[in-house]
A protein has these predicted regions:
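Acidic/histidine-rich catalytic neighborhood of metal-dependent amide-processing enzymes
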Residues: 1-45, 58, 63-78
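His/Asp/Glu-rich mid-to-C-terminal helical/loop segments that flank catalytic regions of hydrolases
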Residues: 97-141, 182-185, 189-214
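Short alpha-helical segments that sit at the start of domains
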Residues: 139-172
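A structural supersecondary motif
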Residues: 84-91
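Short, glycine-/Ser/Thr-/acidic-enriched flexible segments
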Residues: 29-30, 91-95
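Short helix-to-turn junction characteristic of helix-turn-helix DNA-binding domains
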Residues: 177-178
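Ligand-binding cleft/hinge of the Venus flytrap
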Residues: 49-58
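Alpha-helical metal-binding/catalytic segments enriched in His/Glu/Asp
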Residues: 1-3, 88, 120-121, 187
């Protein structure tokens, strides 16, 4: 702990500077509740991914803010790396009376609890691997949509009903949000447009040469 993370950061300094997010696995097999400790950037995708999975699992969980007392996180998230690292725990450190006492032993943990947490971590890793991210090929100002037959020829200046997102609005949102960082699920969350529709529009714009998948 701590010195191991520091040693690894020293040995893999160049490689770690290319990493955006990670997981610190700790206190994962106790009898207590599932905990989710966020990374140092509140709105980073790693936090959104974990939160979605925990909500979908219908497990009661406790959400903890980033805490400077997380010694490994301090190293990976240091100024030279700034890797957003989060944790899923079961009986989080400092949150149970047995912590760092003689009762914090093999009788306190169980394979069943460990397996529950392992399954959640596996889901998170799979979701990270499956993220679909697009980037606009014209990031400097707005693309001329009429050139690509994407702009309506009649009534283009008319504003649609306030509660209805027109197809054009959705195209504009996808183009605006596709910055090479947000996944299609992130765009869906931020625009309140169904993910399947965001993905369909993104693929359509990719074929039009306006977006590229990264």
């Amino acid at each position: 702990e701590t010195i191991g993370a520091i040693s690894y950061c020293h040995l893999k300094e160049k490689e770690l500077q290319e990493i955006d997010m990670g997981l610190v696995i700790t206190t994962v097999a106790g009898p207590g509740p599932i905990g989710f400790k966020k990374s140092f950037e509140e709105h980073h995708p790693i936090n959104k991914i974990i939160r979605r999975i925990l909500q979908k699992s219908n497990s009661d969980f406790i959400e903890y803010p980033f805490d400077i007392n997380g010694s490994d996180e301090r190293q990976y998230s240091a100024k030279g790396f700034r890797i957003n690292t989060a944790s899923i725990t079961k009986s989080k450190y400092y949150e149970y009376s047995e912590y760092h006492t003689s009762d914090d032993n093999l009788q306190f943990i169980s394979a069943e609890n460990l397996n529950e947490t392992l399954n959640l971590y596996t889901e998170v890793i799979n979701k990270i691997d499956d993220r679909i991210i697009f980037e606009s090929v014209s990031p400097y100002c707005e693309t001329m949509l009429s050139k690509h037959n994407l702009y309506p020829t009649v009534g283009g200046a008319q504003k649609p009903d306030i509660d209805v997102k027109s197809k054009l609005d959705k195209v504009l949102w996808v183009l605006f949000k596709s910055d090479g960082k947000l996944s299609t699920e992130d765009v869906s969350d931020e625009t309140n447009i169904d993910h399947s529709e965001i993905l369909k529009i993104s693929r359509f714009l990719e074929k039009k040469g306006l977006l590229k998948e990264i």
